[in-house]
UniProtKB/Swiss-Prot annotation:
This is Polyribonucleotide nucleotidyltransferase. Its main location: cytoplasm. Involved in mRNA degradation. Catalyzes the phosphorolysis of single-stranded polyribonucleotides processively in the 3'- to 5'-direction. One of its GO terms (biological process) is mRNA catabolic process. Residues 554-613 form the KH domain. Its cofactor is Mg(2+). GO terms for cellular component: cytosol. One of its GO terms (molecular function) is polyribonucleotide nucleotidyltransferase activity.
Amino acid sequence: MQRETISVPVGAQEIIFETGKIARQAGGAVVVRCGETVVFTTACAAPNADSTTDFLPLRVDYQEKFSSAGKTLGGFIKREGRPTEKEVLVSRLIDRPIRPMFEEGYYNEVQLLSFVWSYDGINSPEPLAICGASAALVISDIPLIKPVGAVRIGFIDAQFIVNPTIEQQKQSKLDLLIAGTEEAVLMIEGFCDFLTEDQVLEAIEIGHRSIKTICQTLEQWRAKVGKPKNRETLRQLPKELYADVESIANPLLEKALRICEKQKREEALAEVTKAVNDRLMPENEEPKYPAKHIAYVIKDVSSKMMRQMILNENVRSDGRTSTDIRFIDIEQSLLPRAHGSSLFTRGETQALAVCTLGGASMAQRFEDLEGEGNNRFYLQYSFPPYSVGEVGRVGAPGRREIGHGKLAERALMAVIPTKEQFPYTIRLESNITESNGSSSMATVCGGCLALMDAGVAIKRPVAGIAMGLILENERFIILSDILGIEDALGDMDFKVTGDQNGITAFQMDIKVEGITIEIMRVALKQAKEGRVHILNKMLAVCPTYKGEMSRYAPRIETIQIKPSKIAVVIGPGGKQIRAIIEQTGVQIDIDDTGLVNIAAIDLVSIEKAKAIIHGLTAEIEIGRIYSGKAISIAPFGVFVEILPGKEGLCHISEFDVNRINSLDEFVKQGDMLMVKVLDINERGQIKLSRKATLQSQ
C-alpha cells in the first residue's frame, strides 16, 4: 500500500492524516499531525466473534511516550508501564464516542492503540487521538457506521476558540472536548468557570461545525483508501426469538418494571429471565436458541417496554415523573475524627464524603509530558461491590472509578479557594455506600458538603445531577436524576454540575447515533431546575462553610522570606530544616518564591518554628543591640551567637569599660551577653561590643 495523506483545516491549525507507511499489517493504522504533535493509532479486530459474547469487546489504550517531549521517565524504571491517570482518562475519551458507532451485531474483539510520538507543547494530543482512532477504523475492514471527529473548545475574552493551544488553555474559562458525526453530537466533556447554559450550547455548536468538516474529510478518505467492510460476522438475531421472548416476558415485565425498590425490581426481573429460560431452554433438551442470545433479547425487550412506559405514560420504574427528583437526606459531621464529613443520600444512591486537610507535602505529585507538578486539591472515588449488593474485586481503582472521580474533582475545582486564600492541601474521598444511578453526582454534592463541614472557604456551593433520555424517532423525553436501570436501558447519560448562576462541569455519553442541539437545550434547562432543587436541599442543612476548622485539623501559618534565604533555612543536605522539624514537631514546606508554610496541630509549635526561621533569616543590623550566647572563648575575645547560625567576635578590648587581661574571670561558655553590632566587614564577619552596651546604660 502506498503512502496516502489527507488534511483538514481546524481552528488556526491544519490536521494531517497519513497511512500506508507505518504498521501496514494492522487492520488500520493512521498517523495524525498537528503542528509538531504526532499521534499514531492502530485498529485491529479478531477474525471471528466469540459465540458466547453478547456485547462489543472493545479495548482502547492511549499512551504518552516521554520521548515525544524529549524526556525520560523519572525514577528507577525508565520504561512506560502502568497507565497514568491521564492516560486512563484519554482512553475513556476515545472509547465513549467510538463505541456506539459500530454496526449492530458486530461482536468481534476490537483493539484501538494510540501513542503520542511527538509533542510540541502547543497542540493538544487528546482530540487528535480521537480523530486518529476514528480514521484507523474508517480505513480498516471493521464495520464502523460513519466517521467520528473531535475538537477542543476554549473561551478567552468572551471568544470561543477551536483547538486552543496549551498556553491558551491555561487562560481559558472553558475546557470542552466534543466528539460527534457529521449529523450529531456523540460525546461531550467540559469544565468551566460558571458559564451559562446558553454559552455552553454555543460552544457545542461551534465545536460541531468543525467536527462536520473533519467527518466529511474522513469520509472522502474512506472512499479513496478504505478497505471493504467485513460484515460476514455480523450477528442477526432471528425474529422468531424476539417473538418467543416477548410472548413469555411481556406480561411479567409489565409488573416487574413498575416495582419501586431496586432490589425487589431486580429480583422480579430475574424471575422474568428464569421464566423465559425455562421455556426456551428446558432441561434435558437441546435449547432452541443460545443462552447469550436469549439474554440479549430479554434486555432489549425490557428496554423497549420501559421506554414505552415512560414515553406514553410519563411514569418511571420508581413511580416518578420525568422531572421528579428522588428524596434527599443529608447528615453532616458524622465522623468525629475526620476534618470534615457528609453522608449524602438521594433515593437508593448514597455517598459518604470525607475531607482531609494537610500541608503542601500531602499534595498529589504527578509527572507528564509538561513536566512534574503537584495537585493541592484532589478527589478519590471508590465504588465497592457491596454498594450494589454484590461480591467483587477490591483493590486499585478501575477505569470507571478514575473517570467518575476526575469528573467530580473538576466539578468542585471551580469553587476551591486559591493557595493564598487557603494554604491547605485538600483531599476528598467519596465512598459510594449505595448505588442506584448518579453516584458521581452524589459525589459532587457530598464532596461539596464535606468541604464546607471542614471549614474550606469555597467560593460558592454547587450540586450535580444526571439526566437521561428516551428517544424514539422524533419523540423524546428527558429524565431528571436517572436510576441505574434508566442509565442501562436509556439512550443518554448527561451529567451537569453547578449552581443557579452557571455550570462548572458537564459530561454526556449516548448510545444512539447522536443527538441534536435542541435535545441538549431541553436537557440543560431541565438539569438546571433539578440541580437548583438539590442545591436548596443542601443549603437548608449547611448554609455556608464552618467558621472554625476541626480541632483535629492541622493549623497552617504562612510567612515570607527572601528567596536568597531559602538555602539558610534548609541547610546543607536539609540538615537545618530537619532540625527545626524535630525540635518543634511541625511540617514545613518552602516554595521557590520564599513562601513558607508551617503546619502543626497546635499553635505553640508553629510559633516556635516561626521564631527559629525568623532568627535564621533575619538581617544583622549595625548599631543594634542583641542578646547572644557565648559560644567559645579565646585569649583575644569571645564569640557570641546573636541569631541562630550568626556569630560575631567581641574583642577583649570591647568586652568591658575597664581594661581586662583575661576573659576567664568574666564570662563562661553558654553565658548570655548583651552586645552591640559595631560593623560587618566585606567578608561578612561581625564585630561586636559589650562595652558599648554598658556605656549606654
